[in-house]
Amino acid sequence: MRKTLVVEAAIEPLVRLRSINREDLEDLRKWKNSVKEGFFFKGEINEMMQKAWFAAYHERPDDYLFIVEHDGKKAGCMGFRLEKGRAEVYNVIASPWGKGKGLMAAGLRLLCSYIGSRHVKNIGCVVVKGNPALEFYDRCGFWISGSAADRDIMTLNWDSFRPVKIDQVDEKDLGRKKRPGR
């Protein structure tokens, strides 16, 4: 059963993480298509593909995707998947409005702090070789812990990472409401 989360902390710049919903799908699709060269799937994502992805996403309880918000505006998105004792950060994409303001770095700091305090300490990501996001992850406390022909594997370095204290996590159950008598 999918839960919706809102994660907040006293962090500057002030950002919050909010679980994605159906109303975010078009923004997510446009953002990903605008930077598709930085991802393994380089094709154009159409509306039908996005809706199919969203339906499948709802079936994966250990997969979380958030909108990064600042002053009520969408700064971008980022997510993580829990697999085999590790959290894989994925889809870190700034919106056109959110680029270059430090909001995504603050969002990633909040995300990793949340993961480390509520789930696992082993946090990483996989970056396509040549993707300029590698420098972003490096600035945010990740280091290259492995490599393959087409990708770099990065891991969060807890010795240099500065976690924030999570102030609030609101959870709402998005499952279907049971009718009385069932």
Model feature map: region roles:
Residues K36-A55:
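Conserved GNAT-fold acetyl-CoA-binding loop/helix
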Residues I67, K73-R81, E88:
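Conserved beta-strand in the GNAT
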Residues G124-E135, D150-T155:
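Conserved beta-strand-loop-alpha-helix junction that forms the acyl-donor binding cleft
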Residues Y90-K101:
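A short, internal acetyl-CoA/4′-phosphopantetheine-binding micro-motif in the GNAT/acyltransferase core
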Residues D138-A148:
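Conserved acetyl-CoA-binding loop of GNAT-fold acetyltransferases
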Residues A55-I67, G76:
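A short helix-loop-beta-strand connector motif used in the catalytic cores of GNAT acetyltransferases and
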Residues G100-Y114, E135, R139:
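Conserved acetyl-CoA-binding loop-helix of GNAT-fold acetyltransferases
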Residues L14-K30:
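A short beta-loop-alpha structural element at the N-terminal edge
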